[in-house]
Amino acid sequence: HHQMTKLRKCGLVTAQVDGKWHRNILRGGSMAAATSLVESNALAVLEIRLSELAQMVEPSETRMAIAAEEDERAFSIRISEPGPTIDGCDAACALVRDLGLAGESQREGDTLARDLLVELSSAQQPITILVLSERLSESRGRVSTVIDRMRSAGLVERVPMIDRIPQDVFSGLVRQLDARGEDWLMTRGGLGRLDEKVSKALVDGASKGSLDIDTVRGIISTVTITDQRVLLNTLGGRMPYGFRLAGADGASVSNRVMRLAERSLRRVRTVSQRLEESLSGNI
């Protein structure tokens, strides 16, 4: 019964009532037809809901300046038609609930998912988990959980905070020089892998106390981003990451999610066709 309820809910199966009997049948009379109906309905509903999201997103010329990392996580989004209004829940709150961004067991009065979506929709630059948790007065764990749901839905993507590298390299240099000395910096600290002029300028500046973040930025400006990230790692730091909406405007975000949904539904259609061929003995 539980599984049949799920099949009816997703639209693959419908029930015909004959007196006291409920007969469950595939919509359209076949797996391929049922899948086609589900696909058409899902894309139509999703397009409507994403148009609501697009109106929330502030266009930005700087949001997409940094290339995002490739995200291999599985696409997952809940597609639900607009439901009845709930007291204390505005349009943005209803949208995150219907898209599954608030989770399966949202607590009454919990607006974290809504607040995060609003915050990211207006952000002009990627924002770290730490900054988001401080702005919303929430734990980093809860913020990270909601961000992961948004990433799975294709709404949000993670990007390296390139502008933060000089700051973290400076902190690592000063800390490791005091703790381990110049020899360690040139060997295990990773400076020996860089051009001699670059490594010498960094070590001399750190030793004389004349180094600051802007100076580090100028010195490593000729170093590739890949080597900057390696240097940061060998100095004991970690590449800082931020999160942003996956588009410069609402239309871009909506188009990305629609592409991911269409790709997933094509896979479902392919599986249904193969299943039908198998059942009919054509394979």
Which residue stretches match the model-derived regions?
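Amphipathic alpha-helical dimerization/coiled-coil segments
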Residues: 30-76, 181-283
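Basic amphipathic alpha-helical segments that dock to polyanions
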Residues: 3-7, 116, 132, 143-156
